[in-house]
A protein has these predicted regions:
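Short, flexible/disordered secondary-structure transition segments
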Residues: 164, 168, 209-212
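Short, glycine/acidic-rich hinge or "gate" loops at secondary-structure transitions
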Residues: 146, 166-175
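A cross-kingdom marker of C-terminal helix-rich interaction/assembly modules
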Residues: 1-119, 123, 130, 137, ...
Length: 298
């Protein structure tokens, strides 16, 4: 079988616009939103919200609105410390650089003679839109939603791994991505632990209740994205980026010459223990630990 592979590159390519959007944040309500610098003081942000509310309520002053409701606002606010923005930007650059490098690799491969390779290539290539969605969600502090999509990437990589060597349509499309993890772990050994981590975070379990439930002025407040999830999200996106690149190198090992994520050990290709992710992730995680300490002592 020989088939031309066409890529709709411009529609999904990750761009620098994500860098720009992270320098700003939207605040407001269901009627009005405004865009402000991300490092704006909390008091200023609350004053803007109070002004919006007062306007629609017909009040001449924001004072009564601020006094009555401001305790409810930004209870789950993202930290405005510079280290958090820098950490995010470092994670963003790492993900973008690696994902775009491997998108180029997929686009230029010449391996269209086996059906399994064709569908694996397509499945992995289309994940670029999933990566972009994750980064955009992270820029809006939607950490749980970001980790949900990280799990989608894990499942899709697992499926691509299980079908790339297949030659017949019925063998490929009868495989459920949810049933591929066991085989995938034979290559990407951290997959099981990562899947468990993501599942525990994205499902609201009873033991997690204190993380998203707060009581203020004797009223119960639900927070949708506790700030602690940010660090879990960084870990998740770094991990699935490593998984994505490693999976591509392994599946298409017969068609590429340079390897950064896998290496040949005896007669088999295995994860390269000294790959960039291992060292870079430790650097990012150190930054994250510093951020956590700053949060605790703020």
């Amino acid at each position: 079988m020989n088939m031309d592979f066409v890529f709709d590159e411009e529609r999904f390519r990750i761009t620098d616009s994500i860098d720009q959007t992270y320098n700003y944040k939207k605040i407001g309500d269901f009627q009005t939103e405004v865009l402000i610098p991300r490092n704006s003081p909390i008091r200023l942000q609350k004053n803007i919200i109070a002004a919006i509310k007062a306007y629609y309520l017909g009040y001449k002053s924001i004072d009564s609105v601020y006094k009555k409701y401001s305790d409810y606002w930004f209870i789950d606010s993202d930290s405005l410390e510079e280290i958090n923005i820098n950490t995010y930007m470092n994670v963003l650059d790492y993900v973008k650089n690696n994902v775009n490098t491997f998108l180029d690799l997929l686009q230029n491969l010449d391996c269209n003679e086996k059906l399994g390779l064709i569908v694996s290539r397509a499945a992995l290539y289309r994940l670029q839109s999933t990566f972009k969605s994750i980064l955009l969600l992270m820029s809006r502090n939607q950490y749980l939603e970001s980790m949900n999509l990280c799990r989608v990437i894990l499942e899709q990589c697992s499926w691509a791994f299980c079908v790339y060597a297949k030659e017949h349509e019925e063998d490929i499309f009868s495989i459920n991505p949810l049933n591929c993890l066991k085989d995938f772990k034979t290559f990407y050994t951290p997959a099981g632990r990562l899947y468990g981590f993501l599942s525990n975070r994205v499902h609201i379990s009873p033991e997690l209740t204190p993380e998203y439930l707060q009581i203020i002025n004797n009223e119960i407040i639900v927070t949708f994205n506790p700030i602690s999830y940010r660090y879990d999200c960084y870990y998740s996106i770094l991990s699935v980026t490593d998984m994505y690149c490693s999976t591509i190198e392994y599946i298409f090992r017969d068609f590429i010459n340079k390897f950064d994520f896998v290496n040949k050990y005896e007669k088999e290709f295995v994860l390269f223990k000294e790959r960039e992710f291992v060292t870079q992730a430790n650097i990012f995680l150190d930054d994250i630990r510093n951020s956590i300490n700053n949060e605790i002592h703020r």
